[in-house]
């Protein structure tokens, strides 16, 4: 960050693709007036822009993620959300702060919907899960949510099959949804579901446009063209849409040459509705988003995809599903208020039109 922020005239935002790095840069970004971007991840309390004006997490947060997973089980797999009542839900989580973050919220979700939640830890790196899956076999859950990382994900699928649990009832989170998570599991991954904010495949016109204008023109540096349309490649397109449209939003107000504080305003006023996504050719790949002073996530939407091991490809398994924003807000508010108090931060007044429209905070 220190090496790059003033390079070639100065950066106007940073997206480090890391929960740890983006969180570590929160106060540095505030001091330097540098937007820190964490697409689909980051410090959940950072949703509150009145406390974290330079921190943005466009897409979904941890609580969105798990409420959407529960809504998918109810609405799609069971046919009605009311059928969550009485269900047994296990969450297999990575033994880290990231893995543990969803436990309390899952307890809240099951209290709301009348289901039973059991959290089961897998120590890092997760290449041995026999005892955890024996526990799962004994408890006989209706569904298992996989909050995994790295090798833990394919091992979970393989161990589930060995213990007789249907992988079609194993549902992965945002860090358990890539091609690299399922391909190593081989046939054991057949029927596995995972949440995504950017479905895999050539699902939108913008992908074909990139292929035509970049790769066919010999301008790309992607060595393995088979990765076009993969989960992480499409994540790059999703992030690129958010980045570019926020920059354009800032330029529409301030002119073509913008600084980092003005780009902060661009991110905070990023609006992508259906007509905007249609114009970009991104409908189906990118969810609608509406970032505001009090909501630096702005989307709270995701789809699900299911793995076809024979064809080695994902297929879309749902439409956009919204998270339980109302349920998560209390936890987010508590975390943001505590952070503000602990760090002596004066909150912005997001109801004040003049303050909300001020770019140079």
Predicted segment positions?
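Structural recognition of the beta-strand scaffold that forms the well-ordered cores
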Residues: 11-16, 35-40, 55-57, 88-93, ...
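Extracytoplasmic "Venus flytrap"/periplasmic binding protein-like
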Residues: 1-15, 20-39, 48-57, 160-169, ...
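Segments of small-molecule ligand-sensing domains
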Residues: 220-233, 244-317, 323
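Ligand-binding clamshell of periplasmic/extracellular solute-binding protein-like
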Residues: 10-24, 38-47, 65-66, 146-154, ...
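Extracellular/periplasmic periplasmic-binding protein-like sensory domains
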Residues: 52, 59, 159-240
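Conserved C-terminal helix/tail region of periplasmic/extracytoplasmic solute-binding proteins
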Residues: 267-275, 308-361
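Venus flytrap/periplasmic-binding-protein-like
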Residues: 36-47, 125, 166-187, 260-269
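Extracellular/periplasmic Venus flytrap/periplasmic-binding protein
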Residues: 3-6, 44-45, 53-163, 205-208
């Amino acid at each position: 960050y220190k090496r790059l922020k003033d390079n070639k005239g100065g950066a106007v935002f940073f997206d480090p693709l890391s929960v740890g790095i983006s969180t570590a840069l929160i106060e540095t970004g505030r001091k330097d007036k540098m937007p820190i971007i964490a697409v689909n991840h980051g410090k959940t309390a950072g949703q509150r822009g009145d406390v974290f004006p330079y921190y943005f997490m466009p897409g979904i947060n941890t609580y969105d993620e798990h409420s959407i997973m529960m809504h998918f089980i109810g609405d799609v797999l069971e046919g009605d959300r009311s059928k969550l009542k009485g269900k047994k839900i296990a969450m297999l989580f990575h033994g880290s702060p990231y893995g543990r973050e969803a436990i309390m919220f899952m307890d809240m979700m099951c209290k709301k919907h009348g289901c039973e939640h059991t959290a089961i830890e897998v120590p890092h790196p997760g290449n041995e899960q026999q005892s955890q899956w024996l526990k799962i076999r004994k408890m006989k859950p209706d569904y298992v949510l996989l909050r995994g990382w790295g090798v833990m994900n394919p091992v979970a699928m393989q161990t589930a099959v060995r213990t007789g649990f249907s992988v079609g009832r194993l549902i992965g989170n945002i860090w358990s949804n890539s091609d690299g998570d399922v391909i190593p599991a081989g046939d054991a991954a057949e029927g596995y579901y995972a949440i995504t904010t950017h479905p895999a495949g050539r699902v939108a016109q913008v992908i074909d446009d990139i292929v035509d204008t970049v790769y066919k023109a010999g301008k790309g540096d992607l060595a393995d063209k088979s990765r076009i349309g993969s989960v992480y490649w499409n994540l790059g397109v999703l992030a690129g849409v958010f980045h570019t449209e926020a920059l354009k939003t800032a330029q529409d107000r301030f002119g073509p040459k913008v600084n980092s504080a003005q780009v902060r305003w661009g991110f905070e006023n990023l609006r992508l509705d259906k007509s905007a996504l249609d114009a970009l050719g991104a409908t189906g790949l990118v969810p609608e988003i509406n970032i505001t002073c009090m909501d630096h996530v702005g989307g709270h939407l995701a789809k699900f995809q299911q793995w076809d091991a024979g064809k080695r490809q994902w297929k879309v398994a749902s439409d956009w599903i919204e998270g339980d924003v109302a349920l998560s807000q209390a936890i987010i508010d508590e975390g943001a208020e505590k952070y503000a108090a602990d760090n002596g931060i004066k909150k912005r007044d997001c109801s004040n039109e003049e303050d909300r429209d001020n770019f140079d905070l």
